[in-house]
């Protein structure tokens, strides 16, 4: 059994329900060394000439092993610290003048937890960090500055991505609002101008065609080769002078052979066309007889 180091070191033992309890308090300087897991109550409170060094406690990584409940105290010099209370298997261990670096090392060794209060920038020396990381059962975790730096980088990157998305959406929205629509669909200004011009030109062409058709109705078209009117032929056909310039017979001859038909051989067709103009010829003969009768009457009266 190891004795207590320092006259100001003391240890309180009380029954507790929790299997493991760690309490970090502000108190006077006290030190303890327990090597076999048993409690030694020998403490000299009246002796002021004792040791007041800091305490470093190594706690086993497997608290379930009762036979391995040992603590080791290492004196690190007289530095101002705080009180640490450990409650394990119904026994409470109180350590005074414990540095925050040592508490941080113990918490990291047990479960990777961090101190609830913000640690100073220079938390822990490189030698102590190496010693804690080399202990068996220590979880491999990133250090606090590395984790904070990675979180800051991630948040900045996410903020940039969100900002870019918002900017792109805003620009597309403004462009969409400025664009013209036709029945809900986007239409460009050029297409609208083309449609208006085509509508105007089609309206003008329709008017021109209507005027030409009305004039054509007043003037009867005749074949430019044989002189037959458009009413005497089934349809007018295209010729060398343009559309509707030849009658049906002349147009077919021109389209098939590229030459005009011989009018001297067209007497049967002329005879066939006579019944069509029978009424016109009768009217012409009647008018001619009337004119002859009127002329004879005038000559007799003189």
UniProtKB/Swiss-Prot annotation:
Residues 77-112 form the Tify domain. The keyword Nucleus applies. A zinc finger (GATA-type) spans 217-273. InterPro entries: CCT_domain, TIFY-like, Tify_dom, Znf_GATA, Znf_NHR/GATA. Disulfide bonds: none annotated. It comes from the Eukaryota. Residues 147-189 form the CCT domain. It holds the Pfam family tify. Keywords: Activator, DNA-binding, Metal-binding, Nucleus, Transcription, Transcription regulation, Zinc, Zinc-finger. One of its GO terms (cellular component) is nucleus. PROSITE patterns: CCT, GATA_ZN_FINGER_1, GATA_ZN_FINGER_2, TIFY. Transcriptional activator that specifically binds 5'-GATA-3' or 5'-GAT-3' motifs within gene promoters. This is GATA transcription factor 28. It comes from Arabidopsis thaliana. The lineage of its organism: Eukaryota, Viridiplantae, Streptophyta, Embryophyta, Tracheophyta. The gene is GATA28.
């Amino acid at each position: 059994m190891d004795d207590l180091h320092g006259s100001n070191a003391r240890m309180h033992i009380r029954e507790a329900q929790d299997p493991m309890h760690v309490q970090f308090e502000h108190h006077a300087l006290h030190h303890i060394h327990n090597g076999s897991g048993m409690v030694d109550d020998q403490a000299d409170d009246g002796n002021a000439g004792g040791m007041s060094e800091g305490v470093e406690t190594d706690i086993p990584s497997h608290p379930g092993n009762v036979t391995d409940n040992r603590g080791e105290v290492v004196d690190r010099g007289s530095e101002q610290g705080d009180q640490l209370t450990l409650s394990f298997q119904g026994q409470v261990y109180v350590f005074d003048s414990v540095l925050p670096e040592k508490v941080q090392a113990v918490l990291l060794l047990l479960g990777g937890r961090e101190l609830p209060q913000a640690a100073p920038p220079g938390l822990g020396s490189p030698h102590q960090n190496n010693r804690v990381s080399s202990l068996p059962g220590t979880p491999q975790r990133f250090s606090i500055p590395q984790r904070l730096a990675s979180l800051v980088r991630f948040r900045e990157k996410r903020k940039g991505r969100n900002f870019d998305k918002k900017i792109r959406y805003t620009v597309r929205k403004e462009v969409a609002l400025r664009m013209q629509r036709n029945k809900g669909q986007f239409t460009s200004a050029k297409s609208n101008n083309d449609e208006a011009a085509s509508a105007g030109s089609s309206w003008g062409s329709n008017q021109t065609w209507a005027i030409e058709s009305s004039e054509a109705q007043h003037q009867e078209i005749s074949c430019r080769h044989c002189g037959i009117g458009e009413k005497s032929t089934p349809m007018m056909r295209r010729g060398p002078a343009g559309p509707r310039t030849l009658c049906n017979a002349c147009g077919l001859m021109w389209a098939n052979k590229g030459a005009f038909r011989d009018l001297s051989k067209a007497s049967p067709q002329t005879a066939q066309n006579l019944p069509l103009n029978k009424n016109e010829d009768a009217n012409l003969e009647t008018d001619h007889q009337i004119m002859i009768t009127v002329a004879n009457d005038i000559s007799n009266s003189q």
